[in-house]
Amino acid sequence: MQITNSHFFSILLFLWAGPTAANNLPWQPITIADYVITSPASVELGKRLFAEPKLSGNNNISCQTCHHPDHGTSDGLSLGLGEGAEGIGPERMANSGIKKRVPRHSPTLFNLGHKSVIEQFWDGRVSFDPKAPSGFDSPAEDWLPKGLSSLTAVQATLPLTAQFEMAGNTGENEVIGAVRQRIDYAWPVVVERIIADDEYWAMLQNTYPDLQNRSQVNITHLANAIGDYINTQFRSFNAPIDAYARGEDMPLTESQKAGMALFYGKAQCDQCHSGALFSDQQYYSLGLPPMGPGRTRQWDPWARDVGRMGVSNQAQDAYAFKVPSLRNLAFTAPYGHNGAYATLEGIIKHHNNPIQALENYDRSQAILPAASKTLEFIDWVGFNDKREMQRIKQSIDIEPLQLSQEEIDQIIAFLDLLNEPDLIARIRDEQ
């Protein structure tokens, strides 16, 4: 990747003024005004729905199961086990009904309500589209209902209909049965479960005063509330780096200073992890190990994941995934679109020399609960395909960095400034 003029100028600022000068950060501090507007009643309803297993086909999993406060709004697993499994995080256990791991690492929820976020999911398959009837582009296509208020609300509708996430296997319940007919047939089934509960009906009336009777409730009322909850509860803009950006007295260690200079300099981290969210929201191939079943395209004969290409159908997007935010990394391991690395050191070393890291991947880095022999075979089948491995290598968008171990340690020290432990403690207390 080439260093742009603005990037070169930011390096000069660091060299001239020193990395301890707060106004050297090439982004403005986040404020409440940078987030989409939500209502307290909707947030309260969304909080309860977020933890509600009735939204799943077999009444045994909720949004919170895979986006848990104890695991930094993810699940602590490389690839999760969805509907039918038991337990939370790394203790989650498969049973005989689990036919497939969730093909991608559960993404974190921090700052999804920031107005600059215009696409969601690892491949960006949910985005704004003013030409679409609903105003959004999504896998539900024109079956997505009108009235959804945010990208996060749109996102909330989709796991409910996904077999390996929340809907369940064919023949197990009425939700997956409806999905098999048409995706929008499933949402009313879920809504019926919620409006049958008098307490939920009271909360819905409080949130949406225009509702006169239960039959008027549809999936948008539930999804908008879940979206408002996520967009509000997981705002992260009070980490030490934010205090530093605001010019507050925030002494840095020598390692953090050196790591900051590397982040915005030699290591070129900010070429992709830019701005206050530490993501340019673009898509790049890092050549991560082809672990797991992958989110295969409809007619793909291989168990693989081509990433953004599955949405764009552009060959140049093969194996490219959205740049994640770096906020709260200490709480959100493992790392990568398939959680291939259990440690920050591991994922940074992959950036340091992607091809070498791919060829010498240490499978013990993966955090995968024990499952059937079939699932465990699929976890590593991609490594057996030499042509697939070569395609992944040829897709890589980043150049080797040649960082020393000391420099990697310094970058990790800098990244600690992006953690907000008080926020994590609060959302754990409020779950």
Summary of predicted features, one role per range:
Residues 1-9:
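Bacterial N-terminal signal peptides that target proteins for export
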Residues 22-431:
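Periplasmic c-type cytochrome electron-transfer domains
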Residues 16-19:
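N-terminal signal peptide c-region/cleavage motif recognized by signal peptidases
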